[in-house]
């Protein structure tokens, strides 16, 4: 890890964690990141553990976890709750698979509509517009 990640101001901390200051404040409001003590007449300081925590949140977001799910994963981060964490990941994996199925269905419908648009001849209404207006449902559109 980078050297000297202790005693950081919020700006330096945000940069080290790869986010902006508003993201830090947002995570604090959401309870994902504790707000450090503010010594009298001083400014709050952050350390390596805070940087690691923000990176954890960002990594989990990239995998599709919601902030509520990330809060739950953080709660489980003592090394003894692997089964609970695995269960959360299994649910997320199922969600991802369902979304992929939906996206594949949408791709098929859109592909058919684009083909129909390119294949139309004469003064026929646009198949895409007609489909969206409900005049003619493309195959599989009711599932989208």
Curated annotation (Swiss-Prot):
InterPro entries: DNA-bd_dom_put_sf, MerR, MerR-type_HTH_dom, MerR_fam, Tscrpt_reg_MerR_DNA-bd. Residues 10-29 bind DNA. Hg(2+) binds at residues 82, 117, 126. This is Mercuric resistance operon regulatory protein. It comes from Serratia marcescens. PROSITE patterns: HTH_MERR_1, HTH_MERR_2. Keywords: Activator, DNA-binding, Mercuric resistance, Mercury, Metal-binding, Plasmid, Repressor, Transcription, Transcription regulation. GO terms for molecular function: DNA binding; DNA-binding transcription factor activity; mercury ion binding. Residues 7-76 form the HTH merR-type domain. Mediates the mercuric-dependent induction of mercury resistance operon. In the absence of mercury MerR represses transcription by binding tightly to the mer operator region; when mercury is present the dimeric complex binds a single ion and becomes a potent transcriptional activator, while remaining bound to the mer site. One of its GO terms (biological process) is response to mercury ion. It comes from the Bacteria.
